[in-house]
């Protein structure tokens, strides 16, 4: 079996001790207040709150963390952002990842959305010392995280405002399964490179399941990819543009864009080349894939976005900046039509795994497509 599993945003971190513009390295020193809003490390206009959860099998103090965007307090809010939201937008991150995409929040707020993001248990803001990052044995465990988040959101926005759920990569799989189990709960589902199928051939996927089951019976916490690649050789889109590797910048106007300067990442929350991939967690993901294969019955409109091409691999190639290097984008598009009866597939030439981290023109194409689609299915 071959698994390409790095951070789902292809995230690499600055060296330990190097300050991130969002306060990344220091973000682990203080947790958000419990069941109350407090400042978030993303800066003015962003607040977070810790959501206490019931003890699970690990009994390690698992919590979730909800982040909200308040455009009125955000000096970077986009012109024309309305003061009264007309819908709720809840974002779920991917594997070895957390919410940091402030530009996504601002785009949604400009559309009239009340933007929230959820760092799931044992990820990002919710990770606590001694916990296995990202660990779960069933994706259904996140129902509690989502339930607690929605209770807090409804306390903010009321019960009449319609909900759009969004997910990136594994977060897209979690969101899809949740939407299937909760008919009538959503106005729409928006997916950014949702991980709906194990990358590689169908044979690899089929053989992988029984092997994983055997390993999981022996030791579900066993990590299967330790030392598999030198971290120094890993290509990460968040590193920014390196002229000695990437050559001349295609457009000088991009010089100050994070695509060139680098995205600000917390190294404790997005580990390079990857957090430990444990067989019990991977089995839980594959069980989710199997549910999608059987066909889901999501009742709301679904937008499934992905890159136009795939170049699986973790080391740099000229194609790495314009393709999905983490999952098979073609397989995702094929599987997406099995999510429900009304599914829109959008593919973006030049897009990377997290489409919102693509080069500036592609990013704008992604946001433009989202605006048009939401005008048709969400905005009133």
Name each model-derived stretch.
Residues 298, 304-306:
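Short beta-strand/loop motif that positions the catalytic acidic residue
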Residues 26-82:
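N-terminal cap/lid segment of alpha/beta-hydrolase-fold proteins
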Residues 70-119, 127-129:
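Short, surface-exposed "cap/lid" segments of acyl-processing enzymes
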Residues 273-294:
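Active-site nucleophile elbow and catalytic-triad environment of alpha/beta-hydrolase enzymes
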Residues 95-96, 124-162, 362-366:
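Catalytic nucleophile-loop/oxyanion-hole region of alpha/beta-hydrolase
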Residues 342-380:
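Catalytic active-site module of serine/aspartate enzymes centered on a nucleophile-bearing elbow/loop
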Residues 170, 175-276:
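Alpha/beta-hydrolase-fold enzymes
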Residues 311-347:
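Conserved loop-alpha-helix segment in the C-terminal half of the alpha/beta-hydrolase fold
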